[in-house]
Amino acid sequence: MEELIAIVGPTAVGKTELAVAWARRINGEIVSADSRQIYRWMDIGTAKPSPEEQAQAPHHLIDIRDPDQPFSLAEFCDLATAAIADIRGRGRIPLLVGGTGQYLAAFLEGWQVPRVAPQPDLRAELELIAAREGPAVLHARLAAVDPVAASRIPPTNVRRVVRALEVYLVSGEPISRLQERKEPPFRPRTIWLHRPRAELYARADARIERMIAAGLVEEVAGLLARGYDWSLPAMSSLGYIQFRPYFTGEADLPTCIERLRFDTHAFIRRQEMWFRRLPNLEIWTPDHPSWREITA
């Protein structure tokens, strides 16, 4: 069974720098495990690898959907599997790189991801219940039919609650049963890039400043001008939804930027909760000999 190297870590930890340098050393190619870098025209806010970085090492699963096109966990697993097979078939080495915890867990742990297609009308109906009656009411419905899933999904995560109910109502099977795992066809070697929390926050704040200077607000305006509205999952992404009050006239720009900082710090904490559960973890800090050698 072949080894699969996965480089994981929270936003702003330094994944791209390490991954590109490592790929260049080992004749490798990068398979992105980022649920937002799949979208075209969303470059700055998603911290997408630059054209220069992508030129140094081939990247897969980046810029594969428009912001109004759906993309599921099952599609990610299928496309990542195909990309890894293609890379290996050409005698090169795949590196799975990203920070989307659910994508990483599903792929590395061998989840059997439900193949239930999105049902827009049903989703809208369930979302309306959450909006009118509160997320707790919707979560209680999930608990009644799939208590295992309900124990794993907080009531505040309306999107995942809706998806779990959607799967049950369409397939008749609880999503928790459909997500039972089997051994993946590779040996995962999961490298968690780790920095102290205060350092991560400072790096994230500095990156936000660079994003603003690079034209993040203009990027959001461009997406709106293309007709992509705030109801789309892509537009709810970190780095985009925080600017909605600015464009609707409800808040000034500094307030929205401060909200982005706050939400990014919270996102880092959630990411780290996912990483702790991944298989075969190696924790690398910046003074780890391999990290230093690869990026030297």
Swiss-Prot record:
Highest taxon listed in the record's lineage: Bacteria
Cofactor(s) listed: Mg(2+)
Pfam family, one: IPPT
Keyword Endoplasmic reticulum attributed: no
GO biological process: tRNA modification
Feature type site, description Interaction with substrate tRNA: T100, R123
Molecular function as annotated in GO: ATP binding; tRNA dimethylallyltransferase activity
Functional description taken from the UniProt entry: Catalyzes the transfer of a dimethylallyl group onto the adenine at position 37 in tRNAs that read codons beginning with uridine, leading to the formation of N6-(dimethylallyl)adenosine (i(6)A).
Binding sites annotated in the UniProt record for ATP: G9, P10, T11, A12, V13, G14, K15, T16
Database matches in PANTHER family: TRNA DIMETHYLALLYLTRANSFERASE (PTHR11088:SF60)
Disulphide connectivity of cysteines: none
EC number: 2.5.1.75
Binding residues for substrate: T11, A12, V13, G14, K15, T16
Protein name, entry field: tRNA dimethylallyltransferase
Start and end residues of each stretch annotated as Interaction with substrate tRNA: 34-37
Keywords recorded for this protein, A-Z: ATP-binding, Magnesium, Nucleotide-binding, Transferase, tRNA processing
Catalytic activity: adenosine(37) in tRNA + dimethylallyl diphosphate = N(6)-dimethylallyladenosine(37) in tRNA + diphosphate
Native source species: Chloroflexus aurantiacus (strain ATCC 29366 / DSM 635 / J-10-fl)
Subunit structure, as described in the record: Monomer.
Listed SUPFAM superfamilies: P-loop containing nucleoside triphosphate hydrolases (SSF52540)
InterPro entries documented for this protein: Dimethylallyltransferase, IPT, P-loop_NTPase
Homology family: Belongs to the IPP transferase family.
